[in-house]
């Protein structure tokens, strides 16, 4: 009988390599956050630190939410959360590298003035990679899953006796999709860790590293 609620010892995608990597990164992220959080309690924070105080916890919370949805087999829900998760990580990197972006953030990040996720990705690609990484259509899949266009069906379909069906509950038979979600989440959580570390001048914590 399939458990109603899975635990870390019996979850459906337990043992997947990318899931293990995601778990390890989450542990490192929480350890780094434990070092940085006390530094955010001061009165004299920089504009970047104040932005990080909002964006970093939200990014981590969404990463944990995605992880729990994978554990419970709700892969489509995890996929839908990827856009808000990625957007926060990208926004944090954008305001770190763009003083005008940071000023927009300080002014309330007005929807009519702030750059789209795609435009932020394009800017960072030019700024950091000199345009070497093709970013065209970067936000398309995220938008598709979020807004529910026909293309989004690919993340909520399984084959039962050779026939495609669209599940309404747990998806326990799509390890490839679980891997895809983890592969998307890992670099952006790592990016948020880098920005957190830079904002509060802390060395990043990785598996096997020593802390004081």
Model-found features: residue ranges?
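Long, charged low-complexity segments
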Residues: 1-43, 104-212
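Short, charged N-terminal helix-start/capping segments
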Residues: 1-17, 51-73
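Short, contiguous, well-structured surface segments enriched in hydrophobic/aromatic residues
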Residues: 30-69, 110
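Residue-level recognition of alpha-helical structural elements
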Residues: 48, 71-78, 131, 178
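Short runs of predominantly hydrophobic/aromatic residues within well-ordered alpha helices
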Residues: 52, 78, 82, 135-138
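Short, hydrophobic, well-ordered secondary-structure elements
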Residues: 56-97
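"Short basic amphipathic alpha-helical interaction patches in structured regions
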Residues: 81-83, 99-108
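Short amphipathic alpha-helical interaction/hinge segments
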Residues: 93, 97-100, 150-153
